[in-house]
């Protein structure tokens, strides 16, 4: 392993010990914000510190085995050869693992996310599939113990959604769900299809990270056009009878956000503003990314909403993830929320991209 990497790991080991000592300090324990921040840092350091300690131990084992080679006993020398082989293999494996753990973390990965699902080409069938995707993400969130809140929805005439925006809150939400941005295509026979023909429909998914108030871009109230209107769609006895729904237009960017899920105009406005802040931030992030990646574009994590990322073929029970040429014949499980089967390979591919970029920079 390179000396510069060893020095970095030694620095992290030292920092881990400092944080551990601070967490036992009475003044830190009494300061909840500081204690929470240090606990989070300690958790983030845990894997890399454990990996480096294992690496150091493997290095000690290798050195001991080398010393054993000097022994006169033939059996001892043979044992030393085997131990050297095992230690070298372990060092190689741990080095790869540590390289990944040292990759720069996206500071937004730990944030909550807004997931926007919109029916595209395909009419009623697209809206029904948008509803299926909403259910899939809800199941996945449930499995991860994340919380879901519907920010806005426009229901389809025959089920599903023309558009639905959900907020997903919990640990590491954006870091996983950001890979879902893009075009999702479905191929299946609609219930209304009497000839049994397979129809193709499309749904667009956009995943934005939540922008905490402290980090939010300043939005000039003069740049906003706010309209109120009566909520539409299903609601039964709870349907809004007042003009509590809100539509906010950000004039400089043309971004429009509607929220009508809450019965209070004040709550709808607050939700609309949080979605608006996330969309404006996404525009700024995209500008920055374009500048940074002008020489090299990461296909996996680009999140280009116009790009077709996945196809769900119901007659064949097949899911095809186009960005990494992954095909799984377990469509039912995926639709029930088993998304890790797709997301983990995507994350690994993204890490491989980052490692390649790092090698280019160092080379």
Curated annotation (Swiss-Prot):
Keyword set, alphabetical order: Cytoplasm, Methylation, Protein biosynthesis
Keyword set includes Cytoplasm: yes
A GO molecular function held by the record: translation release factor activity, codon specific
Localization terms from the record: Cytoplasm
Alphabetized HAMAP family for the sequence: Rel_fac_1
Cellular-component GO terms for this entry: cytoplasm
Protein's name in the database: Peptide chain release factor 1
Basic and acidic residues: bias regions: 284-296
PTM: Methylated by PrmC. Methylation increases the termination efficiency of RF1.
